[in-house]
């Protein structure tokens, strides 16, 4: 199973990724992890990427694609892999097809923006312990205070409504192009496109995703 998982920040993608990788016995591949591993291992591509990152630049697509090809040639990918957050752009998706890396399925966890804003902007965190609350779904006993220590809870910058909306706008801009690209591919290059309602309970989303993937 060679699949790509798409989903906005806060859509519950990480949880579903764990279910998919466990069900098919495949690794989850994210470009961030891959870059860190290549840099740590000191591979030629890793060294090139490190130089660019150290200079404050963005790693070029050709380096990323090269790393992906190296990564998916490893033994643990013999039954497939799950791409998470890659390809991120149309250029990357096209380069993957040209490089002969085909996908069996593209899975999109679809959650309306209003739900994601509600989920994320309601989060409150106790920094010292990492305990997380939600003003609506999992409120502390005393508003704004940690249940255990009574210390203040904060809203992380990442969870502020304005920030969430900006991240969602970027996600939609990138993803719509990818969805369009994959849905137009024909013949052996064409993956199955699966769109799942991510507002359902976690287990219901899991059942729908795995069912559509043939598990």
Curated annotation (Swiss-Prot):
- Ranges for the region named LID are 122-159
Q: Positions of the region NMP?
A: 30-59
Catalytic EC class: transferase
Q: Where in the cell is it found?
A: Cytoplasm
Q: Which GO terms describe its molecular function?
A: adenylate kinase activity; ATP binding; nucleoside diphosphate kinase activity
Where does this protein hold ATP? Answer: 10-15, 123, 132-133, 200
Q: What is its EC number?
A: 2.7.4.3
- UniProt GO BP: AMP salvage; nucleoside diphosphate metabolic process; nucleoside monophosphate metabolic process
Keywords for this protein:
ATP-binding, Cytoplasm, Kinase, Nucleotide biosynthesis, Nucleotide-binding, Transferase
Q: Which Gene3D superfamilies match?
A: P-loop containing nucleotide triphosphate hydrolases (3.40.50.300)
Domain comment from the record reads as follows: Consists of three domains, a large central CORE domain and two small peripheral domains, NMPbind and LID, which undergo movements during catalysis. The LID domain closes over the site of phosphoryl transfer upon ATP binding. Assembling and dissambling the active center during each catalytic cycle provides an effective means to prevent ATP hydrolysis.
Instruction: Give the protein family.
Output: Belongs to the adenylate kinase family.
Instruction: Indicate what this protein is called per its UniProt record.
Output: Adenylate kinase
**From what organism does this protein derive?**
Neisseria meningitidis serogroup B (strain ATCC BAA-335 / MC58)
């Amino acid at each position: 199973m060679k699949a790509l998982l798409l989903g906005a920040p806060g859509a519950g993608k990480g949880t579903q990724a764990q279910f998919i990788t466990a069900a098919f016995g495949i690794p989850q591949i994210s470009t961030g992890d891959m870059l860190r591993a290549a840099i740590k291992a000191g591979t030629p591509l890793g060294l090139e990427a490190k130089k660019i990152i150290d200079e404050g630049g963005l790693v070029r697509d050709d380096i990323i694609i090269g790393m992906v090809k190296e990564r998916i040639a490893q033994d643990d990918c013999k039954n497939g892999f799950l791409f998470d957050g890659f390809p991120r752009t149309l250029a990357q998706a096209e380069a993957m097809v040209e490089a002969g890396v085909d996908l069996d399925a593209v899975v999109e966890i679809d959650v309306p923006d209003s739900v994601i804003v509600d989920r994320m902007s309601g989060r409150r965190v106790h920094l010292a312990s990492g305990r997380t609350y939600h003003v609506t779904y999992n409120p502390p006993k005393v508003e704004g205070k940690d249940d255990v220590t009574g210390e203040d809870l904060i809203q992380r910058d990442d969870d502020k409504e304005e920030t969430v909306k900006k991240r969602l706008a970027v996600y939609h801009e990138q993803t719509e192009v990818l969805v369009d690209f994959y849905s137009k591919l024909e013949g052996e290059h064409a993956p199955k496109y699966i769109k799942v309602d991510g507002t359902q309970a976690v287990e219901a989303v899991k059942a729908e995703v795995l069912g559509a993937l043939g598990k």
